[in-house]
Amino acid sequence: RLHHNQFAIRGGQPLLKEFYLLMVDFFFIRSLISAHILKVGLITEDDVIDIFYSYHAFRQHSAKVEADFRTEIDKVKINDDLSLLQLLV
């Protein structure tokens, strides 16, 4: 997504709003990997590749997904885009 969506170059949204979407991707993929491990008990390289591929297909080829993510982000964030940086602490 960094390369394909030209992070910080495209200029469609403020930088921190774009960073929110990257964090959504990170936490979503991490949750999918964790759920797989909880369900199956282990994870292989092929499983990780499948998870990334499936998430990419869902994320890139569904026109409504990015708008839905942005809407949900705006619902939960605290009146500023800097609340995202708290996730990094």
Swiss-Prot record:
Keywords of the record: Bacterial flagellum biogenesis
Superkingdom to which the source organism belongs: Bacteria
GO term, biological process aspect, one: bacterial-type flagellum organization
Record function comment: Required for the secretion of flagellin and expression of motility.
UniProt protein name: Flagellar biosynthetic protein FliV
Organism: Yersinia enterocolitica
